[in-house]
Every structure is written in structure tokens, then in C-alpha cells.
From Swiss-Prot:
Any matching Pfam family: PsbL
Localization annotation: Plastid membrane
Subcellular location, principal: plastid
Name under which the protein is recorded: Photosystem II reaction center protein L
Record note on quaternary structure: PSII is composed of 1 copy each of membrane proteins PsbA, PsbB, PsbC, PsbD, PsbE, PsbF, PsbH, PsbI, PsbJ, PsbK, PsbL, PsbM, PsbT, PsbX, PsbY, PsbZ, Psb30/Ycf12, at least 3 peripheral proteins of the oxygen-evolving complex and a large number of cofactors. It forms dimeric complexes.
Single GO biological process annotation from the record: photosynthesis
Similarity comment: Belongs to the PsbL family.
Functional description taken from the UniProt entry: One of the components of the core complex of photosystem II (PSII). PSII is a light-driven water:plastoquinone oxidoreductase that uses light energy to abstract electrons from H(2)O, generating O(2) and a proton gradient subsequently used for ATP formation. It consists of a core antenna complex that captures photons, and an electron transfer chain that converts photonic excitation into a charge separation. This subunit is found at the monomer-monomer interface and is required for correct PSII assembly and/or dimerization.
Residue intervals passing through the bilayer: 18-38
SUPFAM superfamilies listed in its UniProt record: Photosystem II reaction center protein L, PsbL
Amino acid sequence: MTQQSNPNEQTVELNRTSLYWGLLLIFVLAVLFSNYFFN
């Protein structure tokens, strides 16, 4: 039971971290593109 629950929790954490990194990367790209277009 514990072996099955641990990988599931790890995958959930990886998905959350990857989602946060993706949002941060999109935010940075949006700022860079906005600066490029305004300049």
C-alpha cells in the first residue's frame, strides 16, 4: 500500500512543480516580448 501511494504523491508533486515552472517561464516570455514590442 505504501509503495503504491508514494509514487503517486511524487508524481503529483512533480506535476505541480512543472506547472509552476511553466507558468513562470510563460510570464518571463510575456515580459520579454512586451519589452521587445514596446521598444
